[in-house]
Amino acid sequence: RMNMFLHNINYDKFDIKLGNTLTEPHFRDEKPFDAIVSNPPYSVKWIGSDDPTLINDERFAPAGVLAPKSKADFAFVLHALNYLSAKGRAAIVCFPGIFYRGGAEQKIRQYLVDNNYVETVISLAPNLFFGTTIAVNILVLSKHKTDTNVQFIDASELFKKETNNNILTDAHIEQIMQVFASKEDVAHLAKSVAFETVVANDYNLSVSSYVEAKDTREIIDIAELNAELKTTVSKIDQLRKDIDAIVAEIEGYEV
């Protein structure tokens, strides 16, 4: 509440509840929501399969499996999805490991992809969020997609270095939003991937698996390098001849 007041948001514009989102969910009477933004804790422990009733919870049952007890990330994702309206969209900040790990997390990714809920995965630069230097991802879920593609955006190079952390400037955000809205492929930045490709890749949703990183290595001109080597070798040969001549001259004086 204090944070809301500090940002000049009047009390009648928000409703904050205290509790465990996963085991004591609030706002069930108010759902569904058209827009959800969430930054849940990364890879925290939760009761998971130790509570046999959770697998029948309407939020988790459709996936057929619960998020691992040691990593609740996908439990928060499924919670948000359940609260989303048929025309809604959710943006969830996630730990990057959930996009490629196997086991239950892979099965949940399969559920999300097979049901066409995954609109976009955005990888961000490290050290953007307070309290962590992790390069996190944003998972965008939608229940009103017009195709079955999954968009991947590599925004890991979009940041401005500040004293203690990195920041996204307005220009960076605008660039990401333009690519997100257009769904166009941009070299080294964004790619829309067919459903079949994601399936063939074992439902891996890691951005680096689909967006080729820019090669920052120096381009070497082999012909130019070879010419320089020949010139250097020629200079060395001439230097050896000069040294031999000097040595011979010195030895002649000694005689």
Regions found by a protein language model. Name each.
Residues T21-E24, R28-V255:
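A conserved structural/catalytic subdomain of Rossmann-like adenosyl-cofactor enzymes
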Residues R1-D29:
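S-adenosyl-L-methionine
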